[in-house]
Protein backbone atom coordinates (compact mmCIF):
# COMPACT_ATOMS: atom_id res chain seq x y z
CA UNK A 1 0.00 0.00 0.00
CA UNK A 2 2.81 2.40 0.86
CA UNK A 3 4.60 1.69 -2.43
CA UNK A 4 1.40 2.42 -4.37
CA UNK A 5 1.00 5.78 -2.62
CA UNK A 6 4.67 6.59 -3.25
CA UNK A 7 4.36 5.68 -6.93
CA UNK A 8 1.24 7.79 -7.37
CA UNK A 9 2.91 10.70 -5.57
CA UNK A 10 6.01 10.50 -7.81
CA UNK A 11 3.88 10.37 -10.96
CA UNK A 12 1.88 13.37 -9.73
CA UNK A 13 5.07 15.38 -9.04
CA UNK A 14 6.47 14.51 -12.48
CA UNK A 15 3.22 15.57 -14.13
CA UNK A 16 3.15 18.91 -12.30
CA UNK A 17 6.85 19.52 -13.04
CA UNK A 18 6.44 18.85 -16.75
CA UNK A 19 3.35 21.05 -16.93
CA UNK A 20 5.14 23.95 -15.26
CA UNK A 21 8.23 23.45 -17.43
CA UNK A 22 6.21 23.60 -20.65
CA UNK A 23 4.23 26.65 -19.53
CA UNK A 24 7.31 28.62 -18.51
CA UNK A 25 9.17 28.08 -21.76
CA UNK A 26 6.11 28.55 -23.96
CA UNK A 27 5.56 32.01 -22.48
CA UNK A 28 9.21 33.01 -22.92
CA UNK A 29 9.42 31.80 -26.50
CA UNK A 30 6.11 33.33 -27.54
CA UNK A 31 6.75 36.31 -29.83
CA UNK A 32 3.27 36.49 -31.30
CA UNK A 33 1.36 39.76 -31.30
CA UNK A 34 -1.87 41.33 -32.46
CA UNK A 35 -0.89 45.00 -32.32
CA UNK A 36 2.27 47.07 -32.58
CA UNK A 37 1.57 48.42 -29.09
CA UNK A 38 2.16 44.94 -27.63
CA UNK A 39 5.57 44.83 -29.31
CA UNK A 40 6.48 48.31 -28.09
CA UNK A 41 5.85 47.13 -24.53
CA UNK A 42 7.56 43.75 -25.00
CA UNK A 43 10.66 45.19 -26.73
CA UNK A 44 10.79 48.42 -24.68
CA UNK A 45 11.34 50.26 -27.94
CA UNK A 46 9.09 52.75 -29.74
CA UNK A 47 10.33 51.46 -33.13
CA UNK A 48 9.13 47.88 -32.50
CA UNK A 49 6.52 46.57 -34.93
CA UNK A 50 4.08 43.70 -35.21
CA UNK A 51 4.67 42.15 -38.63
CA UNK A 52 2.64 39.10 -39.71
CA UNK A 53 1.81 38.32 -36.08
CA UNK A 54 5.40 38.44 -34.77
CA UNK A 55 7.21 41.16 -32.84
CA UNK A 56 10.25 42.69 -34.49
CA UNK A 57 12.55 44.57 -32.12
CA UNK A 58 14.96 46.70 -34.19
CA UNK A 59 17.35 47.46 -31.32
CA UNK A 60 18.23 43.78 -30.97
CA UNK A 61 19.89 43.73 -34.38
CA UNK A 62 23.52 44.79 -34.27
CA UNK A 63 25.49 45.48 -37.41
CA UNK A 64 29.20 45.02 -36.90
CA UNK A 65 31.54 45.83 -39.72
CA UNK A 66 34.86 44.04 -39.75
CA UNK A 67 37.82 46.35 -39.43
CA UNK A 68 41.36 45.93 -40.63
CA UNK A 69 44.02 45.44 -37.99
CA UNK A 70 45.92 48.70 -37.70
CA UNK A 71 49.31 48.41 -36.02
CA UNK A 72 50.26 51.08 -33.48
CA UNK A 73 52.62 52.03 -30.68
CA UNK A 74 50.53 54.84 -29.15
CA UNK A 75 46.94 56.10 -29.42
CA UNK A 76 48.16 58.83 -31.79
CA UNK A 77 49.04 56.15 -34.38
CA UNK A 78 45.36 55.15 -34.62
CA UNK A 79 42.93 56.72 -37.15
CA UNK A 80 40.07 59.11 -36.38
CA UNK A 81 37.22 57.50 -34.44
CA UNK A 82 34.59 58.09 -37.15
CA UNK A 83 34.77 54.36 -38.01
CA UNK A 84 33.96 53.40 -34.40
CA UNK A 85 30.41 53.25 -33.01
CA UNK A 86 29.03 56.46 -31.49
CA UNK A 87 30.85 57.60 -28.31
CA UNK A 88 33.74 55.16 -28.93
CA UNK A 89 37.29 55.97 -29.94
CA UNK A 90 40.38 54.14 -31.14
CA UNK A 91 42.96 53.12 -28.57
CA UNK A 92 46.25 51.33 -28.99
CA UNK A 93 46.08 48.21 -26.86
CA UNK A 94 48.90 46.05 -25.51
CA UNK A 95 48.84 43.77 -28.54
CA UNK A 96 49.83 46.73 -30.75
CA UNK A 97 46.53 47.03 -32.61
CA UNK A 98 44.08 49.92 -32.75
CA UNK A 99 40.75 48.90 -31.24
CA UNK A 100 37.48 50.79 -30.73
CA UNK A 101 36.68 51.14 -27.04
CA UNK A 102 33.93 53.03 -25.21
CA UNK A 103 34.59 56.25 -23.37
From Swiss-Prot:
Localization recorded for this chain is:
Secreted
| Keyword Signal among UniProt keywords | yes
- Where exactly are the transmembrane stretches of this chain? none
Q: What is this protein called?
A: Defensin-like protein 289
Q: Which UniProt keywords apply?
A: Antimicrobial, Disulfide bond, Fungicide, Plant defense, Secreted, Signal
One GO BP annotation is: defense response to fungus
* Protein origin, superkingdom: Eukaryota
Amino acid sequence: MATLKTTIFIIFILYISCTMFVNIFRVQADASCLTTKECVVRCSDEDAQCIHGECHCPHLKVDIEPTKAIRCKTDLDCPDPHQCPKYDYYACLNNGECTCISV
